Structure formats: C-alpha cells, structure tokens
C-alpha cells in the first residue's frame, strides 16, 4: 500500500490538475482583496473565510476520478487486489499534500494581502480545512461519475458541494479561531472518511 501511495503521489505531481487548482487559488486570493479595496478591518476579521472560499472554488475545478474513469484506470483498480476506496482515498490525500504544500509556501503572501498576524491556529485551521475540502470534493466527484459531459459534471459538482459546505464555512471561518472550530473540523474529517467507502461503492456499482 505504501508503494501504491508513492506511485499515485508521483502521478499527481506530474499531472496538470494540482497546478491548475493552485493557479486558480492564487488568482482568487489576489483578486479578492483588489475587489474589496484592501479594507484592513474587513480583511483582518474575515481572512480565514476568504481563504477558505478561495480554496473551495479552486478545489471544485479538480476533476477527481473523472480522467481515471475515462481511460479505464478505475476498472483496473477495481479488478486489482487492492481495496478501491482505499486507492481513491490515497489519491485524494496525495492531491491534498501537493495542494497544501503550495498553500503553505504562499503563506507569507497570504499574510501580506490579508493583513493578519502569524498564528498557529490559522495554520491548523487551513491545514484541517483543506483536508476536509479535498475529501468532500472527492465524495461529490464519485457521485458525479455517471455524468459524461464536462458541463454536466461541473454543474452537479457545484450544485451538490456548495450547500454541503455552507455549515462548515459559517462555523469555521470567523476571526475567533477557538478550539471548537478545530474540533468541528476533526468531526467533519472522520465523518467524511467513514462515508467515503460507502459512497464509492454506491457510485461505482455499475
């Protein structure tokens, strides 16, 4: 399983999907302060929310598992001796590792644009939050595997993912980064990890 994870990780490194997603993330975090006029009080109070929204929309653009289904890789995974949900979960984790590495490399720019201080809670919030976003987008991608057209795929992704993330965005993006936000994120994480194998089995049963 460790070898499989490394293979999936290197496959993702040379894929254009993480590059595209991170490019969109950079675009969102740069354009948002420009649109808001660099209002210091607003950016300082809602910086986590704005960063989360930028992460969300950049992650929504990633066609998780769609390319694998089109080229037959999913079928090979299914016929192999490995557990398919674990393979897909490892692929999501590999994508998240690449994404969060890029985000943390750009953290000084985030502090400069959004004018907030260095806080370990911010790092932890973004770390856990991006992992939850990746899992949730992966779940909705599995549910959208039956959609063949790109426009239909994107429409279903946005329609189903955005309402699901509303409670998460409301409770975890305020200026008061209390510990219950972290506990809520951990709860979301374990919920989605437990739901992932079930939803993968349902969506791929055909």
Curated annotation (Swiss-Prot):
GO biological process, one term: cytochrome complex assembly
GO molecular function term, any single one: heme transmembrane transporter activity
Keywords of the record: Cytochrome c-type biogenesis, Membrane, Mitochondrion, Transmembrane, Transmembrane helix, Transport
GO cellular component: mitochondrial membrane
Compartments reported by the entry: Mitochondrion membrane
Transmembrane segments: 18-38, 45-65, 87-107, 126-146, 182-202
Major subcellular location class: mitochondrion
Keyword Transmembrane helix: yes
InterPro entries: Cyt_c_biogenesis_CcmB
Membrane recorded as keyword: yes
Residues in coiled coil: none
Recorded superkingdom: Eukaryota
A Pfam family assignment: CcmB
Membrane topology, from the record: Multi-pass membrane protein
Function of the molecule: May be involved in the export of heme to the mitochondrion for the biogenesis of c-type cytochromes.
PANTHER family documented for this protein: CYTOCHROME C BIOGENESIS B-RELATED, HEME EXPORTER PROTEIN B
Family per similarity comment: Belongs to the CcmB/CycW/HelB family.
Protein name: Putative cytochrome c biogenesis ccmB-like mitochondrial protein
Record organism: Arabidopsis thaliana (Mouse-ear cress)
UniProt gene name: CCMB
